[in-house]
């Protein structure tokens, strides 16, 4: 499939480390946060679109639709901030992970999606956004991370609950 990020952002060909042209000068850590957050959103959106096709579990489909809605909003918010800074947030999904999920169907898919995207990816995102909200040097990015953090933490809790109910119903 095509890049997941293409659905909500046309990626620039500029390298990730490009300095803003006349915009705010960002620290390398802030630039890395932009790239990591953008990839996280793109991966979750792409994987969740696969979930809508490959899952047969209505709970997984409901979770996936919520991830698409929320991460699209988060991605647009990040793109608006980075556009003002003239920093390219060229989101590209983790194609290896999304590609692996595309090969699975039914319960195998559901378990892999909930564990790898629902729990593991959201745990990484919580860590990323927590770090940025506490230690970021750019005030706009710190504030954006702080605003997004409760949403991502809620997603992690939803995923853990879903994983628990799936384990309970499959044994």
Q: Can you name each region flagged by the protein language model?
A:
Residues 3-171:
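His/Met- and acidic-residue-enriched segments that coordinate or traffic transition-metal cofactors
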């Amino acid at each position: 499939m095509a890049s997941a990020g293409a659905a909500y952002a046309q990626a620039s060909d500029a390298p990730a480390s490009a300095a803003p042209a006349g915009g705010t000068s960002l620290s390398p850590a802030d630039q890395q946060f932009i790239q990591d957050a953008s990839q996280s959103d793109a991966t979750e959106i792409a994987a969740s679109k696969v979930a809508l096709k490959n899952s047969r579990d209505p709970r997984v489909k409901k979770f996936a639709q919520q991830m698409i809605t929320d991460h699209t909003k988060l991605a647009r918010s990040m793109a608006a901030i980075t556009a003002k800074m003239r920093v390219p947030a060229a989101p590209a999904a983790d194609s290896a992970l999304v590609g692996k999920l595309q090969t699975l169907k039914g319960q195998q898919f559901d378990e892999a999606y909930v564990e790898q995207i629902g729990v593991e990816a959201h745990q990484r995102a919580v860590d990323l956004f927590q770090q940025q909200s506490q230690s970021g040097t750019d005030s706009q990015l710190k504030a954006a991370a702080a605003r997004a953090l409760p949403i991502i933490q809620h997603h992690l809790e939803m995923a853990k609950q879903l994983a628990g109910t799936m384990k309970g119903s499959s044994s």
